[in-house]
């Protein structure tokens, strides 16, 4: 799809073949579509988890793993009419970088980009922003990718409260001037840098 069909918010890389690649936590893609189903052709350079929202409601969390393209059904058996999809990367870029190749909808269905909101918030943070352990049942659990979910952390909660679009610039253990437990005052993010939204 093109910018008239799909909206990306956050730091992403637009590739020459039309695919879009991203690794930062919290990056999200939105589109309004007609029809009863929508699927995505995705791949990942590691492993990433994504939240799927349809018409503003959380539907499920999906896992994208491996460089081979996979077609993942995001929603199906929807009522007739126009629906809004939001696919949000909810885990950190250190563990996976996702590529969206295409969206698949019903025959004769349409895709329309979602207009940006009036407000935009950029949150710079660390593991609190990334949602480290937000889906864990025990606060002393070690890091697990499957229990990290930025959508349940303060940055996304504040943005949702104020009905704002957002971008998260966050990495567990990395600070603006110093990393956690590190005396070196240099920060280097090895992730994508193009900001969309």
Functional labels for PLM-detected ranges:
Residues 26, 93-95, 134, 139-197:
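Conserved SGNH/GDSL esterase-like catalytic core that processes O-acyl groups on lipids
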